[in-house]
Structures are given as structure tokens and as C-alpha cells.
């Protein structure tokens, strides 16, 4: 991928990230509320955008940043994908 395309994607992702984060912050739902699932979906989208930015950032791919992104995505996804124990896989990223 050339630098122009990479920079365009990153610029669009920053806009998408700002909109997603603002929507998340405006959602006042708490665990157990009817809107909780929607708030968690917004958080998952936010983390997916962080993964995109980590993946396309200039230089070497940061293993620590990638682990952090995947940990968050797996942890949040665990509540949407049942019977696969994604949280266990997330925790395994940081176990010896």
C-alpha cells in the first residue's frame, strides 16, 4: 500500500473514531440497562478502529499494541459470541 492510501485510510479512521467515541460517551446506559448492548457495540467498534490504526501505523507493528487491541476486542466480543469463551483467549495473550 502506498503512503497516500495509508494516510487517507488513517485520516478516515480518525474521523470514524471521533464519531464512535462521542456516541459511546453520550450513551448513558449502565450494565443491565436496555441500552447496554448498544453501548458495548459502540465500544467494540471503537476498539476495531484502534486495531485498524495500530495495523496501519508507520514503522514496525507493535506487538504490545496489537495484543492490547486484540485483548479488548476479544473481551468485549465474549458477551456477543456465546459458548466460545473468548475471554479465556484474551487472558491467554498476557499469560506466561
Regions found by a protein language model. Give the residues of each.
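A structural signal for well-ordered alpha-helices, especially hydrophobic packing surfaces
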Residues: 16-24, 52-56, 74-84
Amino acid at each position: 500500500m502506498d503512503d497516500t492510501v495509508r494516510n487517507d485510510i488513517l485520516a478516515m479512521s480518525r474521523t470514524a473514531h471521533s464519531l464512535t467515541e462521542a456516541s459511546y460517551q453520550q450513551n448513558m446506559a449502565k450494565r443491565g440497562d436496555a441500552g447496554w448492548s448498544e453501548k458495548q457495540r459502540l465500544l467494540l467498534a471503537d476498539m476495531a478502529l484502534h486495531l485498524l490504526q495500530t495495523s496501519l501505523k508507520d514503522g514496525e507493528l507493535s506487538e504490545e499494541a496489537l495484543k492490547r487491541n486484540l485483548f479488548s476486542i476479544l473481551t468485549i466480543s465474549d458477551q456477543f459470541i456465546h459458548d466460545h469463551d473468548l475471554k479465556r483467549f484474551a487472558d491467554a495473550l498476557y499469560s506466561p
